[in-house]
Amino acid sequence: MKKLFFITLAILSLSFTTAKADNDRVISKEKLPANTLQFISTHFAGLKISYVKEERDLFEKNYQVVFTDGTKLEFQRNGEWKEIDCRYSQVPAAIIPEAIKKYVREHYTNEKFLQIDHDRNDYEVKLSNRLELTFDKKFNIIDIDD
């Protein structure tokens, strides 16, 4: 009986997860939070938006903005940026915390920032030499990945 219960529970949770997994929908940029729109107009004014997508998971909602040049931005529900991926250009300098810029200038002089993301615990940047640097909340380097 116990075995049957766990098998049933596993099947139900798998089907629920699968049903909730694809809750992405294209939305107009006007439906983005106001601070997200301000961020885009400040740092990416010259780029044309290809599409905006609202991504809903079981416990969170994110927004993804994709520009025609391939640049991708991801924002949290509250409109704060989560990830910036500028694979064909570079992340605007004003977005990168000064301590991270200083570290990269000192150790990787001519490299550009292609990507940056952050969460509660750390910042991760990807440089044009393909190195990925991880910094803690106090901007101390904690990992280098090639």
Set out the residue ranges of the language-model regions:
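Bacterial Sec-dependent N-terminal signal peptides
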Residues: 1-24, 40
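Interaction-mediating elements
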Residues: 22-146
